[in-house]
Amino acid sequence: MAADGERSPLLSEAGDGGAGGNGLAGPGGSATGPGGGLTPSAPPYGAGKHAPPQAFPPFPEGHPAVLPGEDPPPYSPLTSPDSGSAPMITCRVCQSPINVEGKMHQHVVKCGVCNEATPIKNAPPGKKYVRCPCNCLLICKVTSQRIACPRPYCKRIINLGPVHPGPLSPEPQPMGVRVICGHCKNTFLWTEFTDRTLARCPHCRKVSSIGRRYPRKRCICCFLLGLLLAVTATGLAFGTWKHAQQYGGIYAAWAFVILLAVLCLGRALYWACMKVSHPVQNFS
C-alpha cells in the first residue's frame, strides 16, 4: 500500500548489521532492540564539526557587515544637487535679482525692490501678459483689443489691436517719475508735474509731498497768517475791553479771530510735520 511505501525507508533491512531482528532505525542511527529499548549505534548528528549532508553544499563563511561589538556607520542624508544655490530671476522693471525658491508654482512673483510683478511662467491658456507704461503687469484675454490700467493714479487706456499706418497721435502718453514713499518706503510712479506736489501712495494710501519745497512754503505762509491773526485778536481784545462789557457781540468777534489764528497755526504745524517722498531720479 501507499502508506507502507512511504514508511519503507524507515524500515531496517535484513542485512543491516546495526539493527536487531525487526527493529526500526531512527534518524540518529539508534535501533530498537528486541526488548523494546533504544540501543545507540552511532553518535548523534552534529556532535563535533561534521560536514552537512551531501545534498546541500556548504555555505561560505564571510565577515558580517557589522560585528557584534561595532557601531553602525554614521547616517549621511542625501542632498539635492541644486540645493546649494537658490533659483533666481531678474526683475523686468528694475533688473534686480528675485529669489523664486518655493514660488515656482506661481505665475508671477513680486520684486522686493520696486514692488512690481514679473512673470515666471507662461500665461494661462487664453490669456496674455501686458505691461502698462506705469510698469503695472496686467493679464487679459488674448482677444482683448483695449484694456485699462487699474491703478488709481494711472487709469491709462492701452490699445492692443493691430497698428494701422497713420499720423502719430498729437498727445503723447504722459511719463512719470518713480518716487520712494516717505511713509512705507515703497516705490510708486508720480505723473502730476504741477506746483501742488502732493501724492498719495498706492501701497499705504497716505499722502506725502514730493520734495520739501511745497510743504515748507505752505508752512511759512500758514504760520505768518496765524501769527498775524493772533496779534490782531490780542489788539482787538485790549482795544474793545470796555466796550465789550456793554455789547456782547464783541466777544463773538474775539472768539472768531482767535479761532482763525488757532486754525492757521495748526495748519502750519501740519505742513511742518508732513512726510516727504524723494524721487528716485532727478527731474528732467
From Swiss-Prot:
PTM-bearing positions, type Phosphoserine: S169
GO molecular function, one term: phosphatidylinositol-4,5-bisphosphate 4-phosphatase activity
PANTHER family recorded: PHOSPHATIDYLINOSITOL-4,5-BISPHOSPHATE 4-PHOSPHATASE, TYPE 1 PHOSPHATIDYLINOSITOL 4,5-BISPHOSPHATE 4-PHOSPHATASE
Region described as Disordered: 1-82
Enzyme class: hydrolase
GO cellular component, as recorded: late endosome membrane; lysosomal membrane; phagocytic vesicle membrane; plasma membrane
Annotated catalysed reactions: a 1,2-diacyl-sn-glycero-3-phospho-(1D-myo-inositol-4,5-bisphosphate) + H2O = a 1,2-diacyl-sn-glycero-3-phospho-(1D-myo-inositol-5-phosphate) + phosphate
Biased composition (Gly residues): 15-38
Name of the molecule in the record: Type 1 phosphatidylinositol 4,5-bisphosphate 4-phosphatase
Lineage: Eukaryota, Metazoa, Chordata, Craniata, Vertebrata
Purpose: Catalyzes the hydrolysis of phosphatidylinositol-4,5-bisphosphate (PtdIns-4,5-P2) to phosphatidylinositol-4-phosphate (PtdIns-4-P). Does not hydrolyze phosphatidylinositol 3,4,5-trisphosphate, phosphatidylinositol 3,4-bisphosphate, inositol 3,5-bisphosphate, inositol 3,4-bisphosphate, phosphatidylinositol 5-monophosphate, phosphatidylinositol 4-monophosphate and phosphatidylinositol 3-monophosphate. Regulates lysosomal positioning by recruiting JIP4 to lysosomal membranes, thus inducing retrograde transport of lysosomes along microtubules.
Keyword DNA damage assigned: no
